[in-house]
UniProtKB/Swiss-Prot annotation:
SUPFAM superfamilies: Ribosomal protein S19. Belongs to the universal ribosomal protein uS19 family. NCBIfam families: rpsS_bact (TIGR01050). It holds the Pfam family Ribosomal_S19. Transmembrane segments: none annotated. The gene is rpsS. It comes from Nautilia profundicola (strain ATCC BAA-1463 / DSM 18972 / AmH). InterPro entries: Ribosomal_uS19, Ribosomal_uS19_bac-type, Ribosomal_uS19_CS, Ribosomal_uS19_SF. GO terms for cellular component: cytoplasm; small ribosomal subunit. GO terms for biological process: ribosomal small subunit assembly; translation. Keywords: Ribonucleoprotein, Ribosomal protein, RNA-binding, rRNA-binding. Protein S19 forms a complex with S13 that binds strongly to the 16S ribosomal RNA. This is Small ribosomal subunit protein uS19. GO terms for molecular function: rRNA binding; structural constituent of ribosome.
């Protein structure tokens, strides 16, 4: 279910402060965050945000196409290594 338009997008306050500070700097460093639930806003375009995936930080360079998505959508938490049986069947043939 989508979020109500009258509420606006959710962005953690501490992340928004870091974004505004980075926009003021001439050469901003990547922003490190654990806030996967925050929505990407137009203020974040052009910044690199390191999003935590549970183990390490995944760098996400924000472009116009990312606006409206959540930060967590670009930092997968699980690695798919394939189904066990399918590799053994290919080798056996």
């Amino acid at each position: 279910m989508a979020r109500s338009l009258k509420k606006g997008p959710f962005v953690d306050d501490h992340l928004m402060k870091k974004v505004l500070k980075a926009k003021e700097e001439k050469n901003p460093k990547p922003i490190k965050t654990w806030s996967r639930r925050s929505t990407i806003t137009p203020d974040m375009i052009g910044l690199t945000i390191n999003v935590h995936n549970g183990r390490d930080f995944v760098p996400v360079y924000v472009t116009e196409r990312h606006v409206g998505f959540k930060l967590g959508e670009f930092a997968p938490t699980r690695t798919f290594r394939g189904h066990k049986g399918s590799v053994q069947k290919k080798i056996g043939k």
